[in-house]
A protein has these predicted regions:
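NTP-dependent small-molecule kinase module
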Residues: 2-4, 25, 29, 139-193
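Hydrophobic anchor at the beta1->P-loop junction of P-loop NTPases
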Residues: 11
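P-loop (Walker A) phosphate-binding loop of NTP-binding proteins
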Residues: 14
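Conserved lysine of the Walker
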Residues: 19
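Hydrophobic positions on the alpha1 helix immediately C-terminal to the Walker A/P-loop
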Residues: 22
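ATP-dependent small-molecule kinase phosphotransfer cores
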Residues: 36-97, 121-122, 135
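Short, well-ordered beta-strand core segments
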Residues: 78, 102-103, 151-152
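A glycine- and Lys/Arg-enriched "phosphate-lid" helix/loop adjacent to the NTP-binding pocket
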Residues: 98-143
Length: 193
């Protein structure tokens, strides 16, 4: 089986949704690079996201984030994980829609909380009531994430690998995004590894 990615796949969703882990596995299975906009921003700024938020503020960060995403979308097709707030920017959303395909990893709040509650690397959760903050962020952001081209409803118990196969299967329904050589013979590509 040979898959060919024609557009960059942009993983969107809440912090803790698995965008980086699932994105890495998806990129591996497709044989394309994996890029992370947060890692690219940190490398360019020589500072962590938390430090950038503290030093320069969220507005400055969002401007730089949009610039980095635009640069990454202009490159060869890859799998790109973006920060939880990146897709909220209308111009960034439009660019992703024009130049790539957005995949929303939709994860239940309890599962998100179980993944992020012990991490100190989430500047937006540095509040007196971080779970309530996470719930409020999800309530605000999910209607915007729902604008993504493809939705994957991640379930508790799904492995990273299984989640990636679900994303790949959804991508295979879009011939403008992914061509799977085995598809013409009736294969669905799930056994490609």
């Amino acid at each position: 089986m040979h898959d060919r990615l024609k557009k960059t796949v942009v993983m969107v969703g809440m912090m803790g949704a698995g965008k980086t882990a699932v994105g890495r596995e998806l990129a591996r299975s497709l044989g394309v690079p994996f890029l992370d906009s947060d890692a690219e921003i940190e490398a360019a700024a020589n500072a962590t996201i938390t430090e950038i938020f503290a030093r320069d503020g969220e507005e400055f960060f969002r401007i730089k984030e949009a610039q980095v995403i635009a640069r990454l979308l202009a490159g060869a097709p890859c799998v790109l994980s973006v920060g939880g707030g990146a897709y909220l920017n209308a111009a960034t959303r439009a660019r992703i829609s024009d130049e790539g395909v957005a995949v929303w990893l939709q994860v239940p709040l309890d599962l998100l909380w179980s993944r992020v509650r012990r991490k100190d690397t989430r500047p937006l959760l540095r509040t007196d009531h971080p779970r309530a903050t996470l719930a409020r962020l999800a309530e605000t952001r999910e209607p915007i994430y729902a604008l993504a081209d493809l939705h994957i409803a991640v379930q508790p118990g799904w492995s990273v690998e299984y989640s990636a196969t679900q994303v790949k299967a959804a991508l295979a329904t879009r011939s403008d995004v992914l061509t799977t050589s085995g598809k013409a013979q009736g294969g669905d590509g799930d056994d490609a590894g």
